[in-house]
Amino acid sequence: MRVVYKAPGEKPEVREISGELESLQDLVEGWIERVGIKKGLALVINEEGKMHRMEPNFYLSKINDLIVGPAVFVGEAGEDFTDISDSDLEMVMLHFTEV
């Protein structure tokens, strides 16, 4: 599954992962939490990132909150995570060109 991975203080990078729960948990370093961005696009973060005082990553105005720890942008189809679309991939990459 094609995703965009964004670590704190780093530029985003496109990655290919298995799409299994464990692969997402490995990337976010713990239990996952889904944050809806828009139809067909979601953000997967560490559910306990703030509790574990993970490093700040970026501010997400849609939910008026600071995202901490590693974040993974994924596509969505219903309740399933999918490859991020070409247009969403481009949008995410452009948004995070500056670290």
Residue ranges of predicted features:
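Domain-length accessory/inserted modules outside core catalytic folds
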Residues: M1-V99
